[in-house]
Amino acid sequence: PWSFFREATRCVVPGGKMFLMEPWVTAWSNLIYRHFHHEPFDPEAKDWEFETTGPLAGANQALSWIIFSRDRERFEKEFPEWRIERIEPRMPFRYLLSGGFSFRSFMPGWSHEAWRTFENCLQPVMNKLATVAYIVLVKVK
């Protein structure tokens, strides 16, 4: 993450924003990512780094949650150029049904709006059900 944030800091002007849609840790996503996703998911990882064997190899699907939620104070200290403007947990079912893991969609296009409406009704419990989070970072320096 250090290389990514250093490069983003170099490229983004003050007031500029980064918009991220990242895997998120909830009771539901913990079950889904641990048992149905091919990449590692370790919310208890002690650090932000993990073993890798090369480009696009090695990962921790919980890393964004670790950085922006669990270790938020550390992020704010290490990257004072960035302010977390918004974290919005989302999509407990649409991501999965749209083929988010395998690219094979189980959700017909015509049903998207119905699923979105259904998920919006779940807002009071979204912190327990979301599989991803919409994250907005603003460069302040």
Residue map of PLM features:
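C-terminal helical/coil "lid" or tail adjacent to the Rossmann-like core of SAM-dependent
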Residues: 90-120
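Core SAM-dependent methyltransferase catalytic element
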Residues: 124-141
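Conserved class I S-adenosyl-L-methionine
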Residues: 18-50
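Active-site rim elements
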Residues: 58-65, 122-124
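A short glycine-rich, Lys/Arg-flanked "PGG" loop and its adjoining helix->strand segment in the class I
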Residues: 2-17
